[in-house]
């Protein structure tokens, strides 16, 4: 069963992880300023294409670098504002960015695979139906996040060791987006 069988239309929502999906991931480190943020090849054009195919595009990202004191919340927000602005300038859109800034060890964390960020997105955009949503990520926690809410899941292959089985695998976000 391929993406064309999912029946994706403008009532669907696209949930995206950030690092390793939208931008180059820094293994063993963090994107701490706009100068370190680099869109992966094809992402701007691919998301511009996807913007006409789905109703909402939402970024959900774990960013414990804030709790670790490596970047301020304002610094992280500035990176996200620049990301959204570049996307708009390219003709696409990102409707919202939700970032879990807590430590992995924090029991109150909203980090994926917990579904808090998706529920927050649904509160902001009540039309979101998780059974008509797709989660695209590059880690087990991304796929588990989507599966917990019965979303379709897409794994972007990376250096990350993944044990969870997604609905489909792709080499890059743009490879997936043009299947919508």
List each model region and its residues:
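Ser/Thr-centric signal marking residues that sit
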Residues: 21, 61, 153
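Metal-dependent phosphoesterase signature
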Residues: 19-41, 66-75, 89, 102-108
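Substrate-recognition element of Asp-dependent hydrolases with the DxDx(T/V) motif
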Residues: 43, 47-80, 96-105, 146
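Flexible domain-boundary/linker segments
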Residues: 31, 36-37, 100, 114, ...
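Active-site neighborhood of HAD-like aspartate-dependent phosphohydrolases
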Residues: 1-58
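Asp-based, Mg2+/Mn2+-dependent phosphohydrolase catalytic module
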Residues: 2-14, 74-93, 105-135, 139-180
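Sparse recognition of residues in long alpha-helices and their boundaries
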Residues: 35-36, 59, 92, 162
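Histidine-centered beta-alpha loop that forms part of the nucleotide-sugar donor binding/catalytic region
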Residues: 25, 62, 158
